[in-house]
Amino acid sequence: MQQLQNVIESAFERRADITPANVDTVTREAVNQVIGLLDSGALRVAEKIDGQWVTHQWLKKAVLLSFRINDNKVMDGAETRYYDKVPMKFADYDEARFQKEGFRVVPPATVRQGAFIARNTVLMPSYVNIGAYVDEGTMVDTWATVGSCAQIGKNVHLSGGVGIGGVLEPLQANPTIIEDNCFIGARSEVVEGVIVEEGSVISMGVYLGQSTRIYDRETGEIHYGRVPAGSVVVSGNLPSKDGSYSLYCAVIVKKVDAKTRGKVGINELLRTID
């Protein structure tokens, strides 16, 4: 694996000079191998190690290199034709392979090659970009978008129209991460490498970026870039120091544990916020 990483790192340093016409065989094979490993879930752009999320920047570099080494080409779809550098993940799937891998794909859901989809996942008409990782038992609902290299945990529900941001550039940015057993409400946006920790519930229409203040009304603490585990979050506003205006924030209205989540439905958690 170190040899593969070395090839990617070296090629990335000279990426401006690489084209589909002049790319060498070693680089092309290395990039294609990485994309295949991401596609199968054998590698992932970020993983939790000793309780901390670690981003493997060289894998993101491989994804970016894939755009340098491939020409656009025509791709046939059910409703129309496409012209792009990245093939569709399911282009060569037959019924036997779909059954073996054990997930459902509802037309016209789109998944790019290099994204991993785990067993018991349901993809409604949605979009999953290259480098993303969608773990077991997750629902990606209608018109939801999972951005490049985003990491989605087990038993997550991404409701209709949810946007999970991609972060291929800038390269130093960490991917957006939704941990296990989270619920993201309709039309919410989680971007810029924000981490929504395990068991959190995000209400409809909540927008979370690195500069969004995430206010815990019980403690008065303000978080940036991270929703603590077990948080129930709604949209809100915080006043300016002089009280002359207010600005958008997200508000943690309560904390719940796994036992409470098991007994109480998501809708009930969001309705009883007082």
From Swiss-Prot:
Top enzyme class: transferase
Residues given in the record as substrate binding sites: 104, 141
Pathway: Amino-acid biosynthesis; L-lysine biosynthesis via DAP pathway; LL-2,6-diaminopimelate from (S)-tetrahydrodipicolinate (succinylase route): step 1/3
Subcellular location: Cytoplasm
Reactions listed under catalytic activity: (S)-2,3,4,5-tetrahydrodipicolinate + succinyl-CoA + H2O = (S)-2-succinylamino-6-oxoheptanedioate + CoA
Keywords: Acyltransferase, Amino-acid biosynthesis, Cytoplasm, Diaminopimelate biosynthesis, Lysine biosynthesis, Repeat, Transferase
Annotated transmembrane regions: none
Pfam families reported in the protein's UniProt record: Hexapep_2 (PF14602), THDPS_N_2 (PF14805)
Top-level taxonomic group: Bacteria
EC numbers for this chain: 2.3.1.117
GO CC terms, sorted: cytoplasm
PANTHER family tied to this protein: 2,3,4,5-TETRAHYDROPYRIDINE-2,6-DICARBOXYLATE N-SUCCINYLTRANSFERASE, MOLYBDENUM COFACTOR GUANYLYLTRANSFERASE
UniProt subunit comment: Homotrimer.
Family per similarity comment: Belongs to the transferase hexapeptide repeat family.
Protein name per Swiss-Prot or TrEMBL: 2,3,4,5-tetrahydropyridine-2,6-dicarboxylate N-succinyltransferase
Organism from which the protein derives: Unknown prokaryotic organism
